[in-house]
């Protein structure tokens, strides 16, 4: 159980990162996390890499009037996601077992909770994001590219990152370091607004 959500999974088959504790909380956790996940009456939220429901179940609970679509191409993840949605009495969650790039559904919010070439999925997200829509973007970058030299740098929006998102037609509204991801590398989260 984490922030009121019960998860069932087999660690031999499915990824679970203890370093993401708090960041999976969406609206029910620490204020610095909730700020990323506060949306103005979204009608549709899509989680592109839903896994076992780390974020999509929290968003379905936090936005009961919204349609939440959870997509993952791993059948084992979908099996646990379906079970976790049932165990948490989530009724506004549609689960799709497919590659997110095969899904052509419009949304007010698209969650890209993935590490490793997340940028490759940003164009698809842009194409299916409603005007003024929001993307929650996770990725790992080298600290020197981000300009992280000390802890005081962690809350600032790095110029390189801002430029990269601008090239992809997004404005960075909010940026935070989640955790160290390896030597001189940080897992980051950003809230992006469609231009």
Locate the predicted segments by residue.
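Non-catalytic substrate-recognition/targeting regions of SAM-dependent transferases
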Residues: 1-19
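Conserved class I S-adenosyl-L-methionine
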Residues: 42-49
């Amino acid at each position: 159980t984490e922030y009121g959500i019960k998860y069932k999974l087999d660690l031999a088959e499915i990824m679970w990162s203890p370093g993401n504790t708090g960041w999976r909380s969406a609206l029910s956790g620490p204020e610095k996390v909730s700020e990323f996940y506060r949306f103005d009456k979204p009608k549709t939220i899509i989680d592109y890499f839903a896994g076992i429901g780390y974020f999509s179940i929290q968003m379905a609970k936090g936005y009961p009037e919204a349609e939440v679509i959870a997509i993952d191409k791993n059948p084992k993840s979908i099996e646990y996601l379906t079970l976790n949605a049932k165990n948490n009495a989530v009724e506004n969650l549609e689960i799709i077992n497919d590659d997110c790039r095969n899904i052509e559904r419009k949304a007010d919010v698209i969650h890209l909770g993935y590490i490793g070439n997340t940028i490759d999925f940003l164009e698809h997200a842009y194409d299916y994001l409603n005007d003024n829509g929001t993307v929650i973007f996770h990725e790992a970058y080298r600290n020197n590219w981000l300009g992280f030299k000390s802890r005081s740098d962690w809350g600032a929006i790095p110029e390189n990152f801002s430029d990269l998102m601008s090239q992809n037609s997004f404005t960075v509204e909010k940026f935070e370091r989640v955790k160290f991801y390896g030597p001189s590398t940080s897992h980051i989260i950003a809230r992006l607004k469609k231009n």
